[in-house]
C-alpha cells in the first residue's frame, strides 16, 4: 500500500453502486475454499480493493482478516464483470480473480469453519467451506 489507510473503491449513488473487488481461488486436494454468509450464496474469498492498495495486497489482507491465514498470490486467473442488486440499487462490479496458495496451514483443510467480515461497519458472520470441484461442475 502506498502509505496510510484509504477507503474501499466502492461508490454509492442514489441510482447505483460501483464496486472493485478481488478474489482468491484457493484449491486443496480437489476442493475450493468458498465463503458463505448465513442464508446466502457461496462466494470466492476476497473483498473490496482500497484506494492506493494493489489487488494482491488486498487479497493478502482479506485472507488474514477473515480466516487468519497467510497466502501468496499466484497468477491472475480471470476478470469478471457482474451486475446484481445491492439492496434496492443495482451494482456494477469489476472483479479480479487470482490463484492463491497457503503459506501456513493454520486453518482446517477440510469441512466447514467459521469466520467473519465487516462491511459498512457491520459484522457479517461467514461459513468457510471446502467444496469439491466436482460439485461445482455439477452445479450443486
Name each model-derived stretch.
Residues 2-23:
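Acidic, metal-coordinating catalytic segment for phosphate/diphosphate chemistry
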Residues 21-23, 70-73:
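Conserved beta-strand residues within beta-sheet cores
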Residues 28:
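A cytosolic small-molecule/anion-sensing beta-strand core signal
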Amino acid at each position: 500500500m502506498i502509505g496510510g489507510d484509504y477507503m474501499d473503491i466502492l461508490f454509492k449513488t442514489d441510482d447505483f453502486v460501483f464496486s472493485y473487488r478481488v478474489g482468491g481461488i484457493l484449491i486443496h486436494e480437489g476442493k475450493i475454499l468458498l465463503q458463505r454468509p448465513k442464508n446466502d450464496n457461496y462466494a470466492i474469498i476476497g473483498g473490496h480493493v482500497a484506494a492506493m492498495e494493489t489487488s494482491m495486497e488486498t487479497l493478502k489482507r482479506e485472507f488474514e482478516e477473515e480466516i487468519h491465514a497467510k497466502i501468496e498470490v499466484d497468477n491472475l486467473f480471470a476478470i469478471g464483470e457482474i451486475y446484481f442488486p445491492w439492496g434496492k440499487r443495482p451494482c456494477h462490479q469489476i472483479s479480479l480473480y487470482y490463484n492463491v496458495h497457503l503459506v501456513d496451514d493454520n486453518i482446517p483443510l477440510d469441512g466447514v469453519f467459521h469466520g467473519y467480515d465487516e462491511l459498512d461497519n457491520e459484522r457479517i458472520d461467514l461459513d468457510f467451506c471446502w467444496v469439491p470441484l466436482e460439485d461445482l461442475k455439477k452445479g450443486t
